């Protein structure tokens, strides 16, 4: 890669390309020329940005047409999972995990689909340009605009298994909006505290790392470096990690054994690429982490100063520069939550799918063990790296080649030896780094509860009884199988019912099971109450007697939306009908009450009954039903509420007063009678005058027997 070759570049320049361009200019043309080039690049950018501004409108947000199919497939998969959960094949945790992984996979697939769709239909779309220029916004935000928002976390940080299937272009439903607002709230709350934290982090870093560069070589042993990988994917290639460092010990070509780079030589971009091309897997380099200089860092361990892509100068405050470099993005990282707001993105294991129709062949030496995945499926866990073969199905005379699948330790195989597979069927998930070792397992007993009541039937389950030393018997299953619960309803038939079905008959819902006969004790007219449509009536009425009231008319009065029925009889009495038309009446029931106002009292007082009996059932508020007639006497009372000092009282308790007597200052009584005084704490509460006649009797003994009895007017006692 000489500098001449690179002068003309015909490609889209995004942030990454720009970075490469500047670093290339630095390496081959030095700082001064690069500064001029950067200036010209800036002018170029501004010139075209102002000539053709990138606008954005709703129509630029194109939703990929395959979205519907992806969502349907995901929903189908979740329905299947739900069925498996209801059948008890998987637990609640496994169901939840499967749902989350399904939606996460769908969301990722949709994101890729969005990119492909933009590339195919309109690579100059403003949304696409913004997302991939690297200047502002990224694909995860575009995914929310035109893909789907995906899974969200609730305030406790738990993932909600209801995904937001819509995007901002289509608009959210009410439920989705509520779920979505959790994340936004989280973003706003966390932001202020984070900004302060990052500034403080920078100060602390500067304080602890005031290292400056002194001396050339401390002669330390070294640190080895290799490409940074995750599973089969290389995240950072070797060349990128080597650039700007100093070699720790001679690098030899793996085949020819010639020295590619000597110890203590700095690694330029060309040398880094040369080392990577030669196939060296690991290079030993110098590092500030292993530097043995007394109070600082030596030149060889530090390597390049990235400001001018050459070895660091003596006395440079490298520690403070490092502290500032770490602290500076801190302020920007605080904005992260603010923009995305709680959208969940998880790691997806790399899926291996079949490229052909064929049969699975697992070699003998491939070490696997049966294992239950976190989704509750039966699978094989690969214990050591190996290869799986797919033998293709013959098409005519042509035998296609076998497909080899490389499996790393910790991968999960979803197919077994001898299984037939179709093209694009999922064969395995190759574990990405970090999740490979699964040593800690724990045994737990999980209960499977039935949602239905019914009779238990075993299908292919062979129960086996074991008795332990304590004499407890447990039943375990010897083979895999299903337990069916035959759900049904139990009916109690009344005595004398005649069955119309036989044992083992199939019946439809609302089918007749048995019939009974009803015999009436009384003769009369049969009447069926009006049945509500769709419901059969359970009652049959037989009218055995009827009463007719002669010369009576019924009038209806309605007040406050209620109808009152009034019955007028021949002798001009008006009754209030208590039994409204259409209600049932029992024998001896009161059906109407007389309306009469001759018995109104003019004053307050006490009621006394003579010979009247009432039924004590029911509430006093509704009145008591009179069982036996008699006399009712209202003894009137005159009450004066006073609430003044006792000194104002002019009569005594129990005194007989004439009408017109002043009982309390400025209060005169209307009737003659006996005074009753109520007082409390020298405050006069109430004065009551009980009217009546005071008679003087010569022989008190003769009248003592008439105490508490009624006396009619003119009666001699």
UniProtKB/Swiss-Prot annotation:
Gene3D superfamilies assigned: 1.10.132.30, RNA polymerase Rpb1, domain 3
Gene Ontology biological process: DNA-templated transcription
Gene Ontology CC terms: DNA-directed RNA polymerase complex
InterPro entries (alphabetical): DNA-dir_RpoC2_beta_pp, DNA-dir_RpoC_beta_prime, RNA_pol_Rpb1_3, RNA_pol_Rpb1_3_sf, RNA_pol_Rpb1_4, RNA_pol_Rpb1_5, Rpb1_funnel_sf
Name of protein: DNA-directed RNA polymerase subunit beta'
Gene Ontology molecular function, alphabetical: DNA binding; DNA-directed RNA polymerase activity; metal ion binding
S-S bonds: none
Catalytic activity field: RNA(n) + a ribonucleoside 5'-triphosphate = RNA(n+1) + diphosphate
Pfam families membership: RNA_pol_Rpb1_3 (PF04983), RNA_pol_Rpb1_4 (PF05000), RNA_pol_Rpb1_5 (PF04998)
Sites where the protein binds Zn(2+): 218, 291, 298, 301
Gene: rpoC2
Function description: DNA-dependent RNA polymerase catalyzes the transcription of DNA into RNA using the four ribonucleoside triphosphates as substrates.
Subunit structure: In cyanobacteria the RNAP catalytic core is composed of 2 alpha, 1 beta, 1 beta', 1 gamma and 1 omega subunit. When a sigma factor is associated with the core the holoenzyme is formed, which can initiate transcription.
Co-factor binding comment: Binds 1 Zn(2+) ion per subunit.
E.C. designation(s): 2.7.7.6
The protein's required cofactors: Zn(2+)
Keywords for the protein's UniProt record, in alphabetical order: DNA-directed RNA polymerase, Metal-binding, Nucleotidyltransferase, Transcription, Transferase, Zinc
Superkingdom of source: Bacteria
Top EC class for this record: transferase
UniProt KW Amino-acid biosynthesis keyword: no
Family: Belongs to the RNA polymerase beta' chain family. RpoC2 subfamily.
